[in-house]
Amino acid sequence: MRLPVVLLFMALAACNPQADEQADKAVTEADRETVPALEDITGRWRVVSIDGETLSAAESEPYLAFSADAAGGSVGCNRFGGMALYAGGRIAAHSWGGDAMACIDPQGEWETAIAELFRAYPQVRLSGDNLRLRSREHVVELMRADGLGPLDRSPDPMRIPVPDLVSQDLANTEWTIRALDGETESSSPIDRHLRFYEETWQGLASCATLFGTYRREGNRLIVEGDIASTEQNCSPEYAALDTAFAELMRDDPHHLVGPNGELIIAGDEHVLTGDRAR
């Protein structure tokens, strides 16, 4: 009984060799993709396509650029960007802004897609001179434009220059939590905070205050031991924010302090953004 079925599949494969070739090509490309180091993506990249739509060559070439603490670019209308932390094959953006010129489509649609992409903590994969940024909703394909090396200015057009290096030490600092996984709603919208002491931290993202210990290794927070919590009494959607907050801190996340009082903490699946408390 099985022989006719086998023969049927063989016949279908023989009738559609192009589909097989495309599938093999997709598998091969996926096998070649790697998680790049920061130095592998630093620099300027030409935007090849956005969500499968190829961008035609123009006088003002669409591009994205990356530095150690920012990302930005243009698709022919506004310049846009923001403070960004790259770690573990993903990019976390603190905020995304730029020029305020009204753009006709398709540039307007492209700008919206790129903004949504960076707000969604996209994955980054490298294959030769090609870079792919992917979120659940959007995919941007890039091609290396200028080789490796530092840029002559920040990719973030909104960056306010500061004369000194920004300290990454978190001890004895207090932050207002701005968003967790892009979610700004909370059962405690006024009291959301994250405080670091010499060896301990505490934070309120939504319902319960979490407590734990930590140490720094470079730009990583190593959270050891249990994470304690006050009593949680809120609806499931708000309680989920507390769960995400705890998972983030257990990930031994990377962190970045920006020049204008910004904070990004990024783990495997979750991202917290905040601003220095005033």
Predicted regions and their residues:
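Lipid interaction determinants
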Residues: 15-278
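Sec-dependent bacterial lipoprotein signal peptides
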Residues: 1-13
